[in-house]
């Protein structure tokens, strides 16, 4: 345990994002009951189920909510909302470059965590192809939804159906707060 804490603190000192994890017994919760509790008053949340062999329930169920970052493309404009203490908003007329920037800031070393940790979750709609290929999209947007939305969830809950446990994880990004030990203990 002390080794994990030491690596966490060293990573933050090097300005590298880290993952905090808490393991719980899954004997009284299901992915659906957990999602219903977590997603209250949440605009962005998800439940992903792994599947094996096309129809058999897989090992993992992943839940996420309360995004740190929301990336959205609408009408040729990419926007990124950062939900930190200082709430920032960034707009770009270059959606693909904006996506590359988002991928770059969402990279970090998972260390010895053996459960899946989704970094970017969402969708890239078909209209996104126009930013990558010279193509004429003749269909008009009649339902007025974003061309793409991706989130970086603040809280990720992973049900391991083999080990019968729950891992609750959160990404911790380097900040001005230098009390790294206190951040870990919270």
Functional labels for PLM-detected ranges:
Residues 1-45, 50-89, 126, 130-186:
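Extended accessory regions or peripheral subdomains of proteins
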Residues 92-139:
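Conserved short alpha-helical segments that host acidic/polar catalytic motifs at enzyme active sites
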């Amino acid at each position: 345990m002390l080794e994990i804490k030491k690596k966490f603190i060293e990573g933050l000192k090097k300005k590298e994002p880290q993952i905090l994890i808490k393991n719980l017994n899954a004997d009284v919760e299901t992915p659906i009951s957990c999602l219903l509790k977590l997603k209250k008053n949440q605009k962005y949340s998800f439940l992903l189920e792994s599947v094996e062999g096309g129809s058999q329930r897989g090992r993992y169920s992943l839940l996420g909510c309360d995004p740190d970052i929301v990336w959205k493309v609408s009408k040729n404009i990419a926007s990124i909302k950062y939900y930190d203490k200082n709430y920032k908003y960034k707009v770009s007329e270059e959606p693909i470059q904006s996506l590359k920037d988002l991928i770059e800031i969402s990279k970090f070393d998972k260390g010895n965590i053996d459960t899946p940790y989704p970094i970017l979750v969402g969708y890239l709609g078909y209209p996104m192809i126009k930013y990558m290929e010279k193509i004429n999209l003749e269909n008009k947007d009649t339902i007025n939804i974003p061309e793409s939305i991706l989130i970086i969830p603040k809280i990720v809950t992973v049900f391991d159906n083999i080990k019968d446990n729950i891992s609750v994880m959160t990404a911790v990004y380097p900040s001005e707060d230098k009390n790294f030990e206190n951040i870990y203990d919270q």
